[in-house]
Swiss-Prot record:
This is Large ribosomal subunit protein uL29. SUPFAM superfamilies: Ribosomal protein L29 (L29p). It comes from the Bacteria. Transmembrane segments: none annotated. GO terms for molecular function: structural constituent of ribosome. NCBIfam families: L29. CDD domains: Ribosomal_L29_HIP. One of its GO terms (biological process) is translation. Belongs to the universal ribosomal protein uL29 family. PANTHER family: 60S RIBOSOMAL PROTEIN L35/50S RIBOSOMAL PROTEIN L29, LARGE RIBOSOMAL SUBUNIT PROTEIN UL29C. It comes from Exiguobacterium sp. (strain ATCC BAA-1283 / AT1b).
Length: 67
């Protein structure tokens, strides 16, 4: 998900998405360990999405207005 899309979300929505992505990341890692993962690049995408959302949450916490 793009940062511009995430910036339009509320803080509660972002926290919810981070939770969903963490759960998905757990499942992807489990699939990787058992050899069932079809698209290993998805792990990277999910990790980056979590990082983007956490960055936006931190910016809001500090009162930084980027973008």
């Amino acid at each position: 998900m793009k940062a511009t899309d995430l910036r339009q979300s509320t803080t509660e929505e972002l926290n919810g998405k981070v939770g969903e992505w963490k759960e998905e990341l757990f499942n992807l890692r489990f699939q990787l360990a058992t050899g069932q993962l079809e698209n290993p690049a998805r792990i990277r995408e999910v990790r980056k999405s979590i990082a983007r959302a956490k960055t936006i949450l931190r910016e809001r916490e500090l009162g930084i207005n980027n973008g």
